[in-house]
Structures are given as structure tokens and as C-alpha cells.
Amino acid sequence: MPKAYENAGVSVEAGYEVVKRIKSHVARTNRPGVVGGIGGFGGLFDLASLGYKEPVLISGTDGVGTKLMVAKLANKHNTIGIDCVAMCVNDIAAQGAEPLFFLDYIACGKNDPALLEQVVAGVADGCVQAGSALVGGETAEMPGMYDEDEYDLAGFSIGVAEKSAIVDGSTIVEGDVLIGLPSTGVHSNGFSLVRKALFEQAGYTVDTKLDELGGEKLGDVLLTPTKIYVKALSPLFKAGVVKGVAHITGGGFIENIPRMIPDGLAAEIELGTWPVLPIFDVLEKAGNIDHKEMYNIFNMGIGMVLAIDPARKDEALKLLADNNEPAYVLGQITADTTGTQIVLK
């Protein structure tokens, strides 16, 4: 055993134990195209085996922010990895990508094999949901950089789309319909405000049970995993009915929906056309947050917004219903008369 490194605060043996524990979780994410297993210096993937004619690789990276601090407070670490995968694969799915493989990065103050196994198990769960292989990762034990009970988590997703099928919003025109896919909760954005409003201002804890939330523990509601939309979107992409997709993450409706819309056009959203989840009402009241500002921070119950030709609206809704995916017609594309590219009515 390397005593000098151990004395510096880095446990090589604990690192070996983590690798041993996560192998079975990695194995269940295997998919066509994966070459070999973990342990090499890089993850291998045979893109040619998938039969794409003009493949374009689409990449994304993200983390889960200070939602990790809620996981720490609740001592619940087995779902935070799903969030990490979701934040990455939803971003690339918004451009029409089929997720292929994923890598994770965990930095910690002290290598705790049991805890890190929970985290990676969650990453593997997310990869299975997304149809993405977990082909590698890094666990960095950094004493002095992090406290012993702290860790950070980030992920990297690579996907592929046919060049002709990339979804970039360029064909969106006035009159196109906006369809929203519901979120499962706060997802993984805005948690600095979440913690301030609920824990500091309102004085709640992760164990607080609120009638507005059905009597569930607040920590459990906040740690509900971010929804992965890959399988919901796939039939729509194959049918060619989607013109643009906005993943509603940091910045809420106000910042994310305009990202898919060409200049000169705007999204007109009819408030009240979908059910806003109770957690957002709790947050608004606890933090004394202006109602309109909520739409500039949180997803407000909608995790994805799709732009669809009105002639194909019913087809898109049927494809979603056939896949047991709820959907709401939120509004339409109009001329941009405000310069903001979005109007909430």
C-alpha cells in the first residue's frame, strides 16, 4: 500500500474498491456499438456499426449544481446521477441526437466507496433510461480542495444524428404550434434560490412535510430526478414532425425558448394551459418571488418545448400519447413585436 500517498489523504485502495463496486452498474448500460469494457485509457465506440449515412456527432456537458447539497442534507445519493445524465442527454436530444455514450466525473474530498457506488448507480440508471452506454469516467480524490464529505459531479454525453435530420429551429415559421412536455419537478436548476427560499427564509428542512406537497418530505420532492426525454422525443424525430426543441433549464422559459427561434419571431405562451406543479407555488411563496420572475428561473412544470407545424400537431400529439407521454399545447409562434422573442400571456 502506498503509505506516502495515504498520508497525504489519498486512498489508492478505496479507489480500487470503487472500481470494483461500479463494474456491474456500468455493465448494465451496454448497448450496440460499444467496444470493450472499462479499464482502458479511453472508451471505444464503433459508430459505423449503427448504419448512419451522414452521421453528425453532437456533444454536451453539464452538472447538477447545488442540488448536490440537498442530496447531502437528505443523505440520499442514489438518484443524483440520473440528474447528471438527464441534464446532458436532454441538451443533445434537443438537437435531434440519439445518445450513444456517456462519461462521468466525480471529484471528492475523501473516497467513500459505498457513497460513490450510489452515485454511479444513479448515473447508470440514467444511462439505461437514455439508451446511452457508460463507457468511462474519473473519480478524483482531492483532499484540501473539498471537505471529506463533499463531492461534485459532472457528465459528458455524445450522441449522433443524420446530418439531414438535425433539429435546429431554422424552419420555424409564424403559426407553428408550441407543445410542452411536463417536468417531474424542479429538475436540476435554480437550487441556490431553492435552498435560500426554503431552508433559510422559510426555515424548512429536508424532513419537513407540507400538505401542499401531499405530505411528502421536502427533500424527497426536491430530489425527484430530472426527467429524461430521449424516448419521448425519438418517435417524433423519426417521423420528422419536430422543427425545434427547447430544453427548459437554467433561465426558465424566458431564456431557453428563444434559443430555438429564428430572429424576427417570438413564442407566445398561454399561461394556464398546463398544470404548474405544487413545488413551484411553495417556492414562490417561501421566497416571496415575483410570479413572472419564476418563469425566468424555473421550468414551472414544463421540461421541453417543441415547435410543430400546425398541420402535424395531431400527429405529434398521437405519437406522444402512444408512448404514454403527456403533452400540452402551450401557444404558438408569432411575429416578434417586443424584441424579447417570448411573450407570456
Swiss-Prot record:
Q: What is its EC number?
A: 6.3.3.1
- Reaction(s) catalysed by this chain's protein: 2-formamido-N(1)-(5-O-phospho-beta-D-ribosyl)acetamidine + ATP = 5-amino-1-(5-phospho-beta-D-ribosyl)imidazole + ADP + phosphate + H(+)
Class of the enzyme per the UniProt entry, highest EC level? ligase
Name the record gives this protein: Phosphoribosylformylglycinamidine cyclo-ligase
Report the locations given in the UniProt record. Answer: Cytoplasm
Its pathway?
A: Purine metabolism; IMP biosynthesis via de novo pathway; 5-amino-1-(5-phospho-D-ribosyl)imidazole from N(2)-formyl-N(1)-(5-phospho-D-ribosyl)glycinamide: step 2/2
Do you know which Gene3D superfamilies this protein is assigned to? PurM-like C-terminal domain, PurM-like, N-terminal domain
Instruction: Please name the PANTHER family in this protein's record.
Output: TRIFUNCTIONAL PURINE BIOSYNTHETIC PROTEIN ADENOSINE-3 (PTHR10520:SF12), TRIFUNCTIONAL PURINE BIOSYNTHETIC PROTEIN ADENOSINE-3-RELATED (PTHR10520)
**Any coiled-coil ranges, and where?**
none
* UniProt xrefs under InterPro entries: PurM-like_C_dom, PurM-like_C_sf, PurM-like_N, PurM-like_N_sf, PurM_cligase
Superkingdom per UniProt: Bacteria
Gene source species: Bifidobacterium longum subsp. infantis (strain ATCC 15697 / DSM 20088 / JCM 1222 / NCTC 11817 / S12)
Which family would the database say this protein is a member of?
A: Belongs to the AIR synthase family.
| Record's keyword terms, sorted | ATP-binding, Cytoplasm, Ligase, Nucleotide-binding, Purine biosynthesis
GO BP term, example:
adenine biosynthetic process
Task: Tell me which NCBIfam families the record gives.
Answer: purM
One GO molecular-function annotation for this sequence? ATP binding
